[in-house]
Amino acid sequence: MITVRMAMARMFAIAALALLAACSGTQDNASTRQLDVLLIPADGGTESGTLADYQPLFDAVGNMADLNFDLKVAQSYGAVVDAMCSGTADIAFVGPVTYLQAKERNCAELLAVAVEDGQSIYYAGLFARNDSPIQTLTDVRGKSVAFGDVNSTSSFIIPITMLMEAGIDPVKDLGALRLTGTHANSLAALIEGRVDVAALSFDSYEKAVRSGIPGARDLRVVARSEAIPYPPLVMSSRLPDDLKQELRQAFKNVEKSPDIQPEMIRGYGGAQVDGYDTQFSSELFDSVARKMTRLSDELKGEILKKSSER
C-alpha cells in the first residue's frame, strides 16, 4: 500500500527532478549565445519564404558553433545598414551595394559568400512581357520601368547604369519610373501591366517561376547584366575576433554538418548552393563600387522626384 508519506516522497522526488531539468535547461540556454540576423527584402518570395530559405542554414551553423540565431527580414535595404551600424544586428544577408555602404561606415565585414558550380556571381536583368514590342535596351526609351529599392544592386543600381550605358537618361528618356521597394513588387507591376519593363535579379525571377507565380512564365529578358559578385553574408565589425573566426569556420564547413541536407543549403532567392566561401576578397566588389559612383546624389534625387510623378 502506498502511504501518504510515500506519495509525498514521490512528489518531492519528481519536483526535484523537474527542478534539476529546469536548471539544466537554463544553463544550456545561457551557454548558447544568441546573435541577431537581418535579411534584406530582396528575393521574389514572401517574408516567410525568405526566412524559410535561410533558417536551415543558420540552424546548422548554430549547432556547429553552439549559437542561436534570431532571423528577421528588414523593411528596406537602408534599414539593414542602419541596424548593422547601430549594433542591433550582428549578421546580415545583404546586396553588394548594401555591403559597401556598411563597410564605408566601418560597420560590417565579409563573413561568407555562397558558391554555386564553383562561382559566386549573379545577374540583374530588365524584363518585359512576351507580347511587348520591346526587344532591346534601346526600345526601353519612352517606356515605363519599375525598379526596386534605391539601395538595391540588381533591381536599381546595375539596371540604371545599363540604361545609361545604352544612352538612355533615366530621368529624361523614360516615360515613367516607379520605385516599388522590392524585386517582387516590380515583377508584379510588370505582370499586371502597370509598367512596360521591370528591373530585378535573375534569382528573384527564377524563384517566381519555380514558385508558380501566375504570369512569371509569360515574360522574357530584354537585357542581362555582366556578372555581379554574389550577395554576401556580413557580420558586425564589433563582434569579438574569436567569435568572427568561429563563424567563418562554421560557414566554411556547413555542408559537412550532419544536421543539414544538401537541399537545405540555400542562397539568394532560395536557390540551392554548394556551400559558402569565407575567403572571398572584398576587392571583388570593386566593380560594383565603380557602378555606384555613376549615380551621384543629385541623380538619385532626380530619380526619386521622377518616381513620385503620376
PLM features: what roles do these ranges have?
Residues L20-A22:
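C-terminal motif of bacterial Sec signal peptides marking the signal peptidase cleavage site
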Residues S24-Q27:
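Bacterial signal peptide processing site
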Residues N29-V97:
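Extracytoplasmic small-molecule ligand-binding "clamshell" domains
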Residues R33-P56, V234-R310:
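An extracytoplasmic/periplasmic, membrane-proximal ligand-sensing/linker region
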Residues D36-T50, D139-S155:
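Short loop->beta-strand "edge-of-pocket" segments that line small-molecule binding or catalytic clefts
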Residues I40-A42, Y123-I134, I228-D242:
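A bilobed periplasmic-binding-protein/Venus flytrap-type ligand-binding module shared by bacterial periplasmic
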Residues G78-A92, R105, T138, T182-D203:
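Short helices/loops that flank or line small-molecule/ion binding pockets
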Residues K143-D242, Q249:
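Pocket-lining segment of extracytoplasmic ligand-binding domains
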